Amino acid sequence: MVKKNDVVSVVTTVGEFIGKYVESSESCITLNDPRMIVHDQTGMGFAKGLCMTGTEEPELGHFYNGQVVFMDKTNERVEKAYREFTSGIVL
């Protein structure tokens, strides 16, 4: 069971996102401090927001269920990297 502030991964039809779970409803999943997952030849990383041209460091992100494939608790290694990226504190 996912609890408030658990770090979760949301897979949508357009990409994968990570953030702290706030709530879900019939229409959407809401994350706090959400980030888009990005990939390049060196590996995986985090964008500063939800899209390449969007607001940096958004407070909330709403993912509408029509585009969500699934949500899962993020694995420990990626959660640690996300927390370091969003807080600036190396754990």
Model region roles, listed by residue range:
Residues 1-91:
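Conserved RNA-binding domains used in RNP assembly and mRNA/RNA metabolism
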